[in-house]
């Protein structure tokens, strides 16, 4: 069956790149079937913000188990946002929630964002994910 991993809130996608590298060098017992790496930013915003991101994105996209998605808003219903992806993944074994941000520095606002996501959409997340990491 294999394992499906969702990475939410990537910035420059270096975390996804490192995860992929580790999985290649040290394959887990259970085969990784897919990695879906997402960012809130559009692709052009990622390329503009992070100088080495094009190389990173190209490396991720070259691997057949990786799907990179931009413009994914974790505060909104995810299942619909993921339905039209090449992998059409709507269920994941592991979810890694990286760096949710509002695009500016404000600790109280960031805390409110996370609270909003977890309070407002717990049922949607439980239906979408088989296990939260």
Language model features: what each stretch is:
Residues 1-24, 28-30, 34-40:
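Conserved class I S-adenosyl-L-methionine
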Residues 2, 87, 91-93:
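Local beta-strand N-terminus motif with an aromatic residue
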Residues 7-11, 70, 87, 110-117:
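Short amphipathic alpha-helical molecular recognition features
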Residues 13-17, 43-47, 76-79, 103-106:
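Eukaryotic short linear interaction motifs
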Residues 18-22, 48-52, 81-84, 107-111:
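Short coil/turn segments at secondary-structure boundaries
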Residues 45-89:
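S-adenosyl-L-methionine
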Residues 92-125:
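Mobile active-site "lid"/loop adjacent to the S-adenosyl-L-methionine
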Residues 128-132:
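Conserved helix-to-beta-strand junction in the class I
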